[in-house]
Curated annotation (Swiss-Prot):
GO terms for molecular function: tetrahydromethanopterin S-methyltransferase activity. The keyword NADP does not apply. Its EC number is 7.2.1.4. It is an enzyme of class 7 (translocase). It comes from Methanothermobacter thermautotrophicus (strain ATCC 29096 / DSM 1053 / JCM 10044 / NBRC 100330 / Delta H) (Methanobacterium thermoautotrophicum). GO terms for biological process: methanogenesis, from carbon dioxide; methylation; one-carbon metabolic process. Part of a complex that catalyzes the formation of methyl-coenzyme M and tetrahydromethanopterin from coenzyme M and methyl-tetrahydromethanopterin. This is an energy-conserving, sodium-ion translocating step. This is Tetrahydromethanopterin S-methyltransferase subunit D. The chain crosses the membrane at residues 4-24, 39-59, 67-87, 133-153, 166-186, 209-229. It catalyses: 5-methyl-5,6,7,8-tetrahydromethanopterin + coenzyme M + 2 Na(+)(in) = 5,6,7,8-tetrahydromethanopterin + methyl-coenzyme M + 2 Na(+)(out). The gene is mtrD. The complex is composed of 8 subunits; MtrA, MtrB, MtrC, MtrD, MtrE, MtrF, MtrG and MtrH. It is a multi-pass membrane protein.
Amino acid sequence: MDPLLLIGAITAGGVLIGGGVHFVPVGGAPAAMATATGVGTGTAMLAAGAGLTGLITAAAMTGQSPLMIMAAGAVGSMLMIGITMLVGNLIYVYGVGTVPVSAKVAVDPLTGMEQEKYVTPGTEGHGLPTVCFVSGIIGGALGGIGGGLIYWALNEALKTLSYGAIGAAGVAAIFAVGIFFINAVIASYNIGGTIEGFHDPKFKRIGRGIVACLIASIVAGALSTLLVYGGVF
C-alpha cells in the first residue's frame, strides 16, 4: 500500500471516530443514578467499547472488500451501543421507575413528545429518549466505519511485509485499537463531561473536536507508516 494512502486512511478513520463520539449519549455518574440523561459511564469508555466491538466484526471480514469491512465494523458498533442503550432503558423504566426524557429540550426533536413534565425535579432528565437512542446509533456507525477503515489499511500494508495473514491481522487490530482510543479520548476532552447527542448544545463543539482528531490522526498515521515501512516489522 502507498504510504500516503495509509496515512490518508488512518486520518479519515480517526476523524470519523472523533466525530462519532460526539453523537454518543453519555451521562456519566449522574446518569448511573438516573439524575441525568444518557448511559451511566464515561464518554471514552462507551465509545471505545463500541469501537472495539466494531473492530472485532470488521476483523471477521478480513479478506473481503474495504466496503464490506467498514460495513461490518459499523454493524458491530451499532449493535453494541444499541443493546447497551436498550438494556439501560429497561433498567431505568422498570427498575428505577423513570421515564426516558431529556431536560435540555422541550420536546423530543424526532418524535415531538413533550419532555419537561416527565422530568423528575432536581434532575437533568433520565434514561435515553428516542433522540438520544438514534444519535447513539449514528455515533456507533461512524466509529465502526472509522475503525474498520483503519484496520483495513493497516492490514493491507502489513500483508506486503514478512507477516502472514494472522500476524498482519493481529498487529493491524492492535494499531487500530490504539488509534481509536487516541481519538476517543480527544473527543471526550472536547466534550468536557456529559453529552446527550446531536441535540445537546455541546454538540456544537464537534468542529473543534474534528480538527483536533484530524491533527492527531495525521501524526498517528505518519508514525504508523514509519513503523510499518521503516523496518520495525
